[in-house]
């Protein structure tokens, strides 16, 4: 605190001498900012503020994990700069229209008045405001207007989620034109990376050891640090797999299991089949998620859940499922519908159980009571995933946890396991996974694509669901178990108030109990579970696959090898196609081989 006071004192003395007289510039009288509006700062915010006031940079990039308080940090900076006349007005640039209102409300707690209704068509604003709220799209549509405003008075420009500044060349050019002459620029992001090579405006890039340019932050506060400080919640991922069946345009029928090593096309179609609201997978997962939410609400009565859908059609279908299954109509938010912002605010302040949204709520929107999520979208870039999960991590009290239900798809499981990994934006990456980023463009204006062209000729035939594994703190727990089973109930019934260490210990105990029961069943079994009600070929294949996946899970926990690696090794040893195309004899051979391997390691 001593360092904070010293830095602030140096800052005040210099600014009071330098700014004893100023001109209004025809834009109205600068409103005073009261020193009584100083909400308490978290540790990282205080350290970053000391760094900022001590160095007085023109450009500053703060990277802080979603939910850690970037907004409050920026508003405190703005209040300090206004109070000592370093700047005379503030412009905050955000991705969506809803965030304009959200920021304006937050600013009031810091003694600041920001105009959320400022429009390009009518650029006048009341002199009672300290500044204005605008979107990236709004700036891009008329950069000259915003350049004139910025040049007329000493301006602090705050960029919320600055990675959007690289969404298009025209956007980047517009932002540079509008705010190139700003007195101060403060950039914020929880995800300082993109899926393309578009440079982010006003962000510094430095070459790494390989000569590749990487973005450089002035202050970084990651998820792991925030978790240790109790600023964010621990996140538990419940990954659901299952057999998916579909028909292509030629009439050929296919079957595959989510989570198996599959081609990109097979993975996409199995994933799409699972997310079909008319199938069996989504109702089963929604049932499990609602059960988990009810468990949390026993300790946190206003805890809420959110389903993130791919498009408007499925969002409405999921809402109908929720209404039928829970006897409570959820809040539905579609960014192209009038009143969507008001519905988000109403849900955030209420106690309703479920919200269904199409991407709009996945970034920046503050709904602290969200504790359970269903990731029912096919978006899989690190940027979108990180922003989506960020909606659930904001901590309100010690011990709160977040539970996210995801399809057991390899790239999602990898992202879930690497939640604590720090990423930077890299320019010129040699092998980029995809040039398409689902967050490209302004989320407020982006079209929420309906299912169509790519899915014509594709027919989902159904998918069952089973809990494949639980991921926490980068580790996998549990083995595959059907929905509705006692083993699934053990994981869904985890207490709602646990810190990270308690959660880790409990998951280890649940896993040990599950593996012990499975081992006892294996010792007592004399025949594979392929008789009785499973006399059909389809039933036998289903049971054999389930048995194999259970053994693969056991091998995974014993060896630390990924599920996919174990499947590939079995194919190398035993031969044959991927499991979805394997015969009963081929699957039995893999089961025998894996049992032998497991017994050798026992």
Swiss-Prot record:
The lineage of its organism: Bacteria, Bacillati, Actinomycetota, Actinomycetes, Mycobacteriales. PROSITE patterns: HELICASE_ATP_BIND_1. This is Uncharacterized protein MT2985. It comes from Mycobacterium tuberculosis (strain CDC 1551 / Oshkosh). It comes from the Bacteria. It holds the Pfam family ResIII. PANTHER family: HELICASE ATP-BINDING DOMAIN-CONTAINING PROTEIN, TYPE I RESTRICTION ENZYME ECOKI R PROTEIN. Residues 523-534 have a biased composition (Polar residues). Residues 430-439 have a biased composition (Basic and acidic residues). To M.leprae ML1624. InterPro entries: Helicase/UvrB_N, Helicase_ATP-bd, Helicase_Restrict-Modif_Enz, P-loop_NTPase. Residues 51-210 form the Helicase ATP-binding domain. One of its GO terms (molecular function) is ATP binding. Residues 430-452, 518-538 are annotated as: Disordered. One of its GO terms (cellular component) is cytosol. SUPFAM superfamilies: P-loop containing nucleoside triphosphate hydrolases.
């Amino acid at each position: 605190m001593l360092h904070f006071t010293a830095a602030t004192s140096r800052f005040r003395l210099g600014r009071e001498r330098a700014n004893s007289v100023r001109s209004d510039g025809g834009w109205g009288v600068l409103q005073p900012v009261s020193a009584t509006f100083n909400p308490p700062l978290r540790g990282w915010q205080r350290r970053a503020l000391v760094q900022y006031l001590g160095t007085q940079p023109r450009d500053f990039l703060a990277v802080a994990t979603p939910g850690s308080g970037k907004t409050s940090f920026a508003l405190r900076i703005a209040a300090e700069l206004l109070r000592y006349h370093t700047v005379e007005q503030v412009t905050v640039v955000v991705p969506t229209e809803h965030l304009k209102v959200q920021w304006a409300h937050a600013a009031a707690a810091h003694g600041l008045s920001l105009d959320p209704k400022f429009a390009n068509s009518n650029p006048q604003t009341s002199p009672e405001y300290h500044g204005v709220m605008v979107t990236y799209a709004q700036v891009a549509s008329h950069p000259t207007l915003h350049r004139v405003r910025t040049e007329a008075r000493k301006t602090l420009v705050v960029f919320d989620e600055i990675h959007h500044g690289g969404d298009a060349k025209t956007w980047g050019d517009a932002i540079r034109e509008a705010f190139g002459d700003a007195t101060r620029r403060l950039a914020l992001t929880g995800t300082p990376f993109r899926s393309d090579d578009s440079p982010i405006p006003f962000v510094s890039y430095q070459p790494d050891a390989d000569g590749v340019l990487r973005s450089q932050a002035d202050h970084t506060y990651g998820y792991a640090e925030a978790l240790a400080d109790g600023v964010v919640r621990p996140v538990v991922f419940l990954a659901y797999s299952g057999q998916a069946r579909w028909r292509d345009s030629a009439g050929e029928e296919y079957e595959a299991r989510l989570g198996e090593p599959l081609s990109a096309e097979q993975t996409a179609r199995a994933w799409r089949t699972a997310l079909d609201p008319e199938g069996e997978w989504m109702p089963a997962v929604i049932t499990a998620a609602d059960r988990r939410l009810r468990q949390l609400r026993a300790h946190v009565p206003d805890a809420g859940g959110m389903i993130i859908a791919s498009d408007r059609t499925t969002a409405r279908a999921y809402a109908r499922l929720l209404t039928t299954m829970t006897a409570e109509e959820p809040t539905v938010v579609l960014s192209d519908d009038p009143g969507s912002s008001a519905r988000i605010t109403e849900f955030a302040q209420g106690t309703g159980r479920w919200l269904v949204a199409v991407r709009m709520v996945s970034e920046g929107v503050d709904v602290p009571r969200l504790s359970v999520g269903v990731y029912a979208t096919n978006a899989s870039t690190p940027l979108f995933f990180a922003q989506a999960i960020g909606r659930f991590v904001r901590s309100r009290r010690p011990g709160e946890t977040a539970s996210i239900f995801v399809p057991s798809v390899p790239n999602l499981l990898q992202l879930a396991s690497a939640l604590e990994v720090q990423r930077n934006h890299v320019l010129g990456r040699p092998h980029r996974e995809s040039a398409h980023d689902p967050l490209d463009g302004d989320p407020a204006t982006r079209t929420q694509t309906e299912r169509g062209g790519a899915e014509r000729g594709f027919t989902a035939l159904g998918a069952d669901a089973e809990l494949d594994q639980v991921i926490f703190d980068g580790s996998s727990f549990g083995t595959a178990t059907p929905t509705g089973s006692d083993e699934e109930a053990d994981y869904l019934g985890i207490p709602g108030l646990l810190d990270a260490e308690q959660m880790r210990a409990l998951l280890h105990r649940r896993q040990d109990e599950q593996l012990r029961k499975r081992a006892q069943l294996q010792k007592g079994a004399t025949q594979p579970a392929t008789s009785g009600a499973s006399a059909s070929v389809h039933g036998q294949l289903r049971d054999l696959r389930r048995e194999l996946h259970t053994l693969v899970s056991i091998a995974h926990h014993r060896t630390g090898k990924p599920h996919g690696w174990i499947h590939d090794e079995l194919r190398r040893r035993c031969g044959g196609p991927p499991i979805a195309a394997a015969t009963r004899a081929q699957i039995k051979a893999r089961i025998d081989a894996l049992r032998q391997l497991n017994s050798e390691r026992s």
